[in-house]
């Protein structure tokens, strides 16, 4: 592999040190290595902001691991940044001097505002939707809040509160009591209050979280079969569960890993304060943050206003997809959707996910014609899909698995991107679109009327079409039978 195509971004955070190594290929990035080590640098700061020798040694030990990987990458293509703890530490110079010797490249201590800007760029490059957004990143010693639209930020704030510092300040007795949560939330709201008006002034339509706390919440909700939207009600529910556990060392929540458990209560308290103070309705997980912002900055790639479309194009190119056929199926599925939208009330994001499934439905053919839907589902589950959340990836994989042959209803109910009923509806439309576009020519797609009454679908074809298309009739009859097996009434006329 040509080393000139490799790039590395290292984030010396207050809780963890992270390294991301990517390969640049045809204007997009391919992740090669992700290494994360819990260093808890912020825990080594005393009241005089002096960083302990033990904390520094933990950091240097981690950097020795990173240094081995950096030997393969040209120095101009490496960026190392340090954040809140090393902004605060009075003896940061000592740590940084040795860090630079270990890594063999410069270490830059960035301002809170620059950290917020880079986080936003990482989100903008990897997270779907170009609407006005609020980005929240709870770090070990600072929390960044950024508003913006597309690639442009409108406000940037870095606040002195984080999951490690709040752990040491409000949960130092390791007691998960209501009083400790109350104190932690009140303190976080006090920190937020001076910037809340400006954030609300700029406004947002969507809110995304880019931190370990939000990642932990996503893992918990996936494990417990909830949908992926984080809400205040869910946060309060998890807080009560933590309080029931009593002590930090006894904290057990389904889906919460041991690695994340230590700073989870403090991060949860900060997030509850943010939701409450800013009246956030819901939040989803971002696709990237600081490290992705660093990488895309080195590559000087413009932010694609439609990240999902870029992702679909890259995958289609990689797996040699017949894009004419993909577009034909998508056009037909969209036509069906418009005909039933008054009855089914499918939301715009669900429509977008249906059309994404149409664009990807044939990627399994790149493996083998036999069991192509299984191959397609496997690929989508395991590919990196910038712009799509983990739950959305799971839905796409489930739709591709069920694009033909008998329906696996349980798989449609096990995804949590959309309600089970909506997943069933999207699946039905996808299957019909694939069936009627099967001859791969626009002029051979018949005029089809589709009507929905509750879950009953009535499909009307031109009067003599079935008589002149015996194979088509056989395929439609088979599809009607398969749908009837899972109690999806389909009447063909």
Swiss-Prot record:
Official protein name in the record: Guanosine-5'-triphosphate,3'-diphosphate pyrophosphatase
What's the name of its gene?
gppA
GO biological process entries: guanosine pentaphosphate catabolic process; guanosine tetraphosphate biosynthetic process; nucleobase-containing small molecule interconversion
Q: In which pathway does it act?
A: Purine metabolism; ppGpp biosynthesis; ppGpp from GTP: step 2/2
Is the keyword Hydrolase in the record? yes
Recorded hits in NCBIfam families, A to Z, give: PRK11031.1
Its Gene Ontology molecular function terms? Answer: guanosine-5'-triphosphate,3'-diphosphate diphosphatase activity
Q: List the disulfide bonds.
A: none
- Keyword vocabulary terms for this entry: Hydrolase
Question: What CDD domains does this protein map onto?
Answer: ASKHA_NBD_EcGppA-like
* Family, as annotated: Belongs to the GppA/Ppx family. GppA subfamily.
């Amino acid at each position: 592999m040509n080393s000139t195509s490799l790039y590395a971004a290292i984030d010396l955070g207050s809780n963890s040190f992270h390294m991301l190594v990517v390969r640049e290929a045809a204007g997009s990035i391919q992740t090669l290595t992700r290494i994360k080590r819990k260093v808890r640098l912020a825990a080594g700061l005393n009241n005089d902001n002096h960083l302990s020798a033990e904390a520094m040694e933990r950091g240097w030990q981690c950097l020795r691991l990173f240094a081995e990987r950096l030997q393969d990458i040209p120095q101009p293509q490496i960026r190392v940044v340090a954040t809140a703890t090393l902004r605060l530490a009075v003896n940061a110079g000592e740590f940084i001097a040795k860090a630079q010797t270990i890594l063999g490249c410069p270490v830059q201590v960035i301002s809170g505002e620059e950290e917020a800007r880079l986080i936003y760029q990482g989100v903008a490059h990897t997270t779907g939707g170009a609407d006005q957004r609020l980005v929240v990143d709870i770090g070990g010693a600072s929390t960044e809040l950024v508003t913006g639209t597309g690639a442009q930020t409108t406000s940037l704030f870095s606040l002195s509160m984080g999951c490690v510092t709040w752990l040491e300040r409000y949960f130092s007795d390791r007691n998960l009591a209501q009083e400790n949560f109350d104190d932690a939330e009140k303190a976080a709201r006090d920190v937020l209050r001076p910037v809340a008006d400006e954030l609300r002034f700029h406004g947002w339509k969507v809110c995304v979280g880019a931190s370990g706390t939000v990642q932990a919440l996503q893992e918990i909700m996936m494990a417990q079969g909830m949908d992926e939207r984080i809400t205040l009600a869910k946060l309060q529910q998890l807080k009560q569960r933590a309080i029931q556990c009593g002590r930090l060392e006894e904290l057990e929540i389904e889906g919460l890993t041991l690695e994340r458990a230590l700073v989870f209560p403090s991060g949860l308290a900060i997030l509850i304060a943010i939701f409450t103070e800013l009246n956030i309705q819901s939040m989803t997980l971002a696709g990237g943050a600081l490290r992705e912002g660093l990488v895309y900055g080195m590559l000087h790639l413009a932010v694609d206003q439609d990240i999902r479309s870029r992702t679909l194009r890259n995958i289609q190119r990689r797996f040699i997809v017949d894009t004419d056929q993909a577009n034909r199926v998508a056009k037909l599925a969209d036509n069906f959707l418009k005909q039933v939208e008054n009855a089914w009330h499918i939301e715009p994001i669900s429509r977008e996910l249906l059309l994404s499934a149409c664009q990807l439905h044939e990627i399994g053919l790149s493996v083998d014609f036999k069991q192509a839907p299984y191959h397609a589902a496997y690929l989508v589950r395991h590919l990196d899909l910038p712009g799509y959340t983990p739950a959305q990836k799971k839905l796409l994989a489930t739709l591709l698995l069920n694009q033909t042959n008998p329906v696996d209803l349980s798989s449609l109910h096990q995804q949590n991107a959309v309600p089970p009923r909506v997943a069933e509806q999207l699946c039905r439309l996808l299957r019909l679109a694939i069936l009627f576009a099967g001859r791969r020519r626009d002029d051979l797609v018949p005029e089809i009327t589709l009507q929905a009454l509750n879950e009953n679908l009535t499909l009307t074809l031109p009067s003599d079409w079935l008589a002149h298309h015996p194979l088509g009739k056989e395929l439609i009859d088979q599809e009607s039978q398969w749908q009837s097996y899972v109690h999806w009434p389909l009447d063909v006329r």
